[in-house]
Amino acid sequence: MHQDNSMRRAINQSRNGGSDSCDINNDREHDNINRNSYINNFHIENINSDKNEQSYIYCSDRAQVTDSILGNRKYTHEENINSTEMFSRTNYEYSNKNNVDIEMYNISNNNFYNGNNNGHSNDIIDYINNNNVNKDLSNTSNNADINTYIKKLTSNQSTAYCDGKGYNESANGSNFDINFRDVIKNNNNKNYKNNNHVPDDMLELGDRSFDSSFYIHNNVEEIDTERSNRLSFMSKLKMYFNYFGPGWIVAIAYLDPGNICGNLNVGLIRSDDFINVNSSVKDYTGYRLLWVLVYGHILGFIFHTLSMKLGHITGLDLAALCRKEFSSKFSYFLYICVQIAIWGAHLQAIIGVFVAINLILGIPVKIAILYTLIEAFAYSFLENKSLDLLEKVLSLLIGILVCCFMFNVFMTPINFQEVASSILYPRIPKGKLLDTMGLLGSVISAHIFYLHSNLTSKKKPVIYNDRMVKRYNKLGTIESGGSLLVSCITNCIIVLTFAEVNISGDDRKADYNLFNAYDVMKKYFGKTSMYIWSFGLLSSGNNASFMCEYASKSVFEGFLNKNVNPFFRVIFSRIILFIMLYAYVSYDKYTIDQLSNFINVVQILLLPLAIIPLYRFSIHKNVLGKFAIKGAFKYLVFVLVISIIVANFLLTLFDFLQYAPSNLYVIFIFISSIFYLLFIIYFFNMPITKTYYKDS
């Protein structure tokens, strides 16, 4: 019990040159005192259980610390969290510390921006080191608990935003500190404990315990700022692999079965001039649209850098920012629309999975669909187990997919001169305008930007300053560029594989799909190639399915600020998708193409719901501050946003009008188009009023 007085004296002497002071609580010597020390984010709390007395010490301001200890003044909660003078930037690891009830303390936005989230007062460290708190870690049963604490301290991810939502907000939208702690000792990182008696109605999604699976041990930050610019190549490589994850998961969206189906159809495009000529004449029309894939991935890279910066700087994902800025009704509307886009992509992913199962094992399609339910259990296990494990599994599946499709390209004689000509000299084959627009529209989907911002929000720098933010942005840019480069090459390989197929006019079908593409592979490349194609398709479907599940989780929590059991969420969505697919397959498995085309149209229409808020937040200084895009790049992105919206809108409009059964249908499409454009204009002009960025 004398340790509390020692600590107060240690901090007191740092202020008053060694002079002692009176105690806040005169009953400290009682054995029934319940002492809890919370050592994180410059915060200590001592609670007297008898008198229910609480004294808070916020070490972000040394004067406030001493005055609080002396009892000279009660500082308000708002004053404490808005204090700007830091105590220390040192990142201590509390190894060999036991008999201290260490609790993780989630702080508000404003307090977090004041400096190192893992900094601690030197006086506090001295107190722990000098008062027999140290124990041999090997002799304690709390080894795992303290290692978890160390893991969090050294994490490259923000303790203020556990799972992306470590904040809370009042009715007027302003941030406040919910005083929630995750008790490390004896809670196995799962149990909830509200030691501050915070009212239940103030506790929302952010009030969840720390999940160590979201954190990695090796820190991306280099604490020694004097040596930070002289990092070795291996250190930089290590930092990259520590960051590794978000970009590769997002790249899955560019390699889903829907994109694969579009790629093979583009590769099998043949000019009308070659339809009736001898099959020995080579037709390179299938090469002509490679430029769409290349430039589409470049567009995706630009928007992914914006979503990546949004997560790093604000610690919030795109969905959470929309919820905080817009009304609850509008947030619900956005959530429903984005969730529809996710379900559409998920349907295409499941189609690829059961088609691959049907090709590999010869199982009937209706039975192969059941595999998707097994896959749901696998995803639920991975999500509950560890996000890091999920990232590794997805990366493995991406590797399998890329290897399978690259193996096929070695079996085809690629004309690299035609490849270069297509990329450097963009042109559209005669009568293939809609195919071109459709391919461009399928490359970029709305939900991937929500997902990317969610993943990068977990990578927010623990040590928050301009240098660290720039480092994280650089790591994110490299990773996004590398993953999208691999995705672009893989998509081009699929196009080139089918572009090299010398199909005569008699063999050329109007449309190829995932069900009959294997006929082409088997006929022109052999049975082995067909199986390799099928395994690549299976990997693509599994990847995309897992990615859609996680995207669904992120938008649900971001827009609604609610949480639901992952098992029930996954099973519920899979049952709905299972019923829809089973109904389509029971009618005719080839009608899946019609469903896929309809999904592509929906994805195109919903894309503005992602790129508009992403652009708006990226240019606003209240959101990104000095990191907001400006100058020529700002106007370039604006032109790209408008061009994508207009191009996709015209594509959809022409597609609908092409099959208009009556004049009444045309009128309906025309009126709907007007409302759609008015909504886009309204969305573009919605104000952004709150501030999320604060100078470090």
Swiss-Prot record:
Coiled-coil annotated residue ranges, if any: none
Transmembrane segments: 237-255, 289-311, 332-357, 363-382, 394-416, 436-455, 476-499, 530-546, 567-585, 597-615, 635-657, 663-684
Entry keyword Membrane: yes
Compartment(s) of residence: Vacuole membrane
Glycosylation sites: 278, 502
Originating species: Plasmodium yoelii
Any further remark recorded for this protein: Culture supplementation with Fe(2+) rescues the growth defects in parasites with partial gene knockout.
Keywords recorded for this protein, A-Z: Glycoprotein, Ion transport, Iron, Iron transport, Membrane, Transmembrane, Transmembrane helix, Transport, Vacuole
Gene encoding the protein: FVRT1
Domain of life: Eukaryota
Vacuolar-side positions: 256-288, 358-362, 417-435, 500-529, 586-596, 658-662
GO MF: cadmium ion transmembrane transporter activity; manganese ion transmembrane transporter activity
Lineage of the species this protein comes from: Eukaryota, Sar, Alveolata, Apicomplexa, Aconoidasida
Description of the deletion phenotype: Repeated attempts to generate a knockout failed. Conditional knockdown results in severe growth defects in parasites during blood stages. Reduced pathogenicity in mice. Reduced sensitivity of parasites to antimalarial drug artemisinin.
Region (Disordered): 1-31
Composition skew (Polar residues), residue ranges: 11-24
Name this polypeptide is given: Divalent metal transporter 1
